[in-house]
Amino acid sequence: MARRFLCTIILLFAGVLTLSAQSLPDGLYARMQTNRGTILLELEFERTPLTVANFVGLAEGTISHSRSGSPRFFDGLRFHRVIADFMIQGGDPLGNGTGGPGYTFADEFHPQLRHDGPGVLSMANRGPATNGSQFFITHVATPWLNGAHTVFGRVVEGQNVVDAVRQGDTIQSVRIERVGPAAEAFQVDQQMFNRLRTEAAERR
């Protein structure tokens, strides 16, 4: 009897979680599973289409990259740099801050996307137009990074997980969720990414 009751509770809880995912507002999301828990990120695909196309293409394995053994670029990588009360950084296949996908692309700065609080998703770089696969998520506002690093999303659930991540923790998977027609239409392939990359380079 107790076992049956427990199974019922588990099924009801799973149903609530599924409903929560289905009830997200229209948008493009990345569900990042870590060994500390899940981080749900909303991606700014309309304001920073190139940067989001890069992230989505790497996550889904639909654009070419230099990491061998896994088409889904981020799965299994570690948070190689964590600074308390600042940010967590991942996306480096080498795990030492020097790795990337084998290419770089231009910055995308939008006036309404700022490093204005906790949970900002932004690109790590080595200077102008050196974006690749490394990203960071903030613990606090970091306004000195505005105009130097491309903001392309924000945590909508799981900031407590961001705050719990420690250096060396693992990104177990990144899965993209599309809600609504605009997000559904944002399908990334190599041709789309190349076009956006060329257009951004020509605007510099």
PLM feature segments, named:
Residues 2, 13-204:
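Cyclophilin-like peptidyl-prolyl cis-trans isomerases
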